[in-house]
Curated annotation (Swiss-Prot):
Residue span of the annotated presequence: 1-24
UniProt entry tagged with the keyword Aminoacyl-tRNA synthetase: no
EC annotation from Swiss-Prot or TrEMBL: 7.1.1.9
Protein name: Cytochrome c oxidase subunit 4, mitochondrial
Keyword Membrane among UniProt keywords: yes
Name of the gene this protein is made from: cxdA
Catalysed conversion reaction: 4 Fe(II)-[cytochrome c] + O2 + 8 H(+)(in) = 4 Fe(III)-[cytochrome c] + 2 H2O + 4 H(+)(out)
Length: 148
């Protein structure tokens, strides 16, 4: 009798989990329970609409957006605050291109429109070993001409 009850309860449990998963219960619960932040909602909106960094839609999205409190305090745009990788790339770009070559805004615009410039990342050997070898230097920026 006990074995029969345990089999019934086990089959009942399996039946309910299949019904619950069919309704998407777990996906809905995870999205609603975690209380996403404004930043997460913006990132999700961009991902859902296939809006990539550097596209006109990306720029328009952040231009139309009211600046967040953190953006006002830090002086950085919400686009840079939302995507740390973009922030790092902009910093490296400014360090490696604008400051190093002392470009005017017109020259910088010309370079951005006509060339693809790498950020000049540090080498893996420079990042990993402790202490850092003295002979390791940053990679030079790689400039490729875009064929228009």
């Amino acid at each position: 009798m006990f074995a029969l009850r345990s089999i019934r309860s086990a089959t009942k449990a399996f039946q309910t989990t299949s019904i619950v998963s069919q309704r998407g219960f777990l996906q809905t619960t995870l999205k609603n329970v975690l209380f996403p932040t404004e930043r997460q909602l913006r990132r999700q909106y961009l991902a859902d609409n296939h809006i990539k960094v550097g596209s006109p839609e990306f720029d328009k999205f952040y231009e139309d957006l009211q600046p967040s409190e953190l953006s006002k305090q830090s002086g950085l745009s919400d686009a840079l605050l939302d995507d740390p990788i973009l922030h790092i790339c902009v910093i490296k770009y400014n360090k490696n291109i604008v400051q190093r070559y002392n470009l005017t805004p017109e020259q910088e615009k010309d370079i951005m429109e006509n060339y693809n410039v790498s950020a000049g990342d540090p080498s893996l050997e420079q990042i990993l070993p402790i202490p850092v070898p003295a002979h390791i230097f940053e990679e030079l920026p790689i400039v490729k001409v875009l064929n228009n």
